[in-house]
Amino acid sequence: MTINSGGKGSVIILDTDGAVIKNLHLTNSGDHHNDLDSGVQVRGNFNVIKDNVIDDCLFGIDLQQSENNIVKRNHISSKDEELGMRGDAIRLWYSFENKIIGNTITNTRDMVVWYSKNNVIKDNTTVDGRYGLHFMYSQYNLVENNSYKNNSVGIFLMYSDGVKILNNTISHATGAAGVGIGFKETSDIVVADNKIIFSSIGLSIDVSPYQPDTTNYFTNNLVAFNGVGIRFLANWKDNVFKNNHFKGNISQIMVMGGKTANRNVWEGNYWDDYEGFDLDHDGIGDTPHDIYAYSDRIWQDVPGAQFFKGSAMLELIDFLERLAPFSEPDLILRDKSPILDVNLDTITIKENNHSELTPESGPEMLPGFKPENELERRLKGYLQ
């Protein structure tokens, strides 16, 4: 069944408890941002909205002061407007204990969670938007097993404490402001088992954690093939990085203002540019992995020098400084126990009829997308 709003207002306004909206095609809402013209506006509790197609609607599903609702397996797209003029796919405002599960979102603006806590956001796919997921002042939410591709920013948390980000894939957050996962004044978070790949910035950390006596934990994440693996916007502390895998990033770490990231804990991470050995074969490097600020990082503090990034001239200057430094370079970070034996459980080797060893292909990063280049084809194994 199709419900067409005729280009005015919201298609359905759900101001009740315990209703079910399913298997509908909701289309052609109004285009007024101030009225939040939506496919479904929810103003109640214990409702179920599932298996619907919502298209040509400014906003998709808008929940305000609504609790214990289920939003599941909906296909949502916005109006055919410029990115900033689209509406949000799913919007939670002062809404608690909701479950946002298994939705497919394309060509919208953001998914936003504002002033909302104890929500579950799981198994969703978001493509071609601005913010795949944007938190503000929202505590104790769970973000698990989602896929974000070709968005300006994958996930961004502002002033949102106690959030768990687990087993998500964030890729192709490109452009000047492209960030896989970003944190601003956010505390007590757990970021584990995520894949953050092919983005301008993998992780961006700004004054996080913010609350006193709190710690942010980053564990077993793959941060690979980004322009910058981790960017610190300040000389901050109390982040713990353990058993993460930094691979194929142009720069592993960037600290603005010429500061250091060594006030954080770095332990047992894999760095593909580690230059040490493992003579006792315990899987741990015999010497620490140190990252110093040499001339190859001048572009981070002098914007005009970015023109020469990767050039032979800058590489020569960097080589000479490493060979005979004029002064002691600044230590950016030290991982005292870098790991060498990477066990990502990613590539299964099998024998074919010709007794050749070949890797099994991994799954696609997102439905409907095929690898676009050789790097992506190589990375498929890591995404299994």
Q: How would you describe each model-predicted region?
A:
Residues I3-S5, I13-L14, L26, V42, ...:
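Extracellular beta-strand solenoids
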Residues I61-I165, I170-S171:
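Solenoidal tandem-repeat scaffolds enriched in leucines and small polar residues
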Residues T2-N23, T27-N47, F59-Q64:
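Extracellular beta-strand-rich solenoid/capping regions of secreted or surface-exposed proteins
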Residues G9-V11, H32, D37-Q41, G60, ...:
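Structural detector of coil-to-beta-strand junctions
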Residues T174-G180, I189, G202-Q211, Y217, ...:
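Functionally critical loop-and-helix segments that line ligand-binding/catalytic clefts
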Residues Y131-G229:
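Eukaryotic tandem repeat interaction scaffolds
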Residues G18, N23, F46, D51, ...:
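Detector for repetitive beta-architecture
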